[in-house]
């Protein structure tokens, strides 16, 4: 389904509840890039609405539905549930040819803080993972650009990130190793977030 659509979000949650009776972990991983990389001054409202609708609005309201289900369930291993938002290094790095994506991921970062603040007292923890350059379908069209950046040393760990790198971070947050932290993020970006001279 499309998490940008209300009916699809409701269908997703009800089918999971029907199958398992509870939701212990929500990973908000759905996301899209602009169909066309356009200069900020040329970006269309349609592109902005599409990216924000899926990446930010979808996350906001799927989390709302899941959090309400988590509030109704007993604690398991000292918590009622864990919500993990996959944002991006683009939450704080400017990319003027895909501004709508940057805005959407900055919004996901704020959603992490908002839901962490609201749900901490209820035993629901909320975390954020900020991937860097990960080898996916989304980055396949710009391989040459990122290969060049990697070769030029933009990333201290000089390689493409892999889906497994993100999955490892998700597993760590989903487990019970971070029971005294919420509203936080981890950069899984090969050190790209380090400001270097």
Residue ranges and their predicted role:
Residues 120, 125, 181-183:
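Short, small/polar-rich loop/turn modules that mediate ligand/substrate recognition or access, typified
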Residues 37-40, 44-49, 151:
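Substrate-binding pocket helix/loop in short-chain dehydrogenase/reductase
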Residues 63, 104-107, 112:
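Active-site helix of classical SDR
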Residues 88:
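Residue(s) in the substrate-gating loop at a strand-loop-helix junction
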Residues 37, 153, 171, 182-197:
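Short C-terminal tail/terminal secondary-structure segment
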Residues 155-166:
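A conserved structural motif in NAD(P)-dependent oxidoreductases
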Residues 68, 72, 117-118, 179:
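Alpha-helical segment proximal to the catalytic Tyr-Lys
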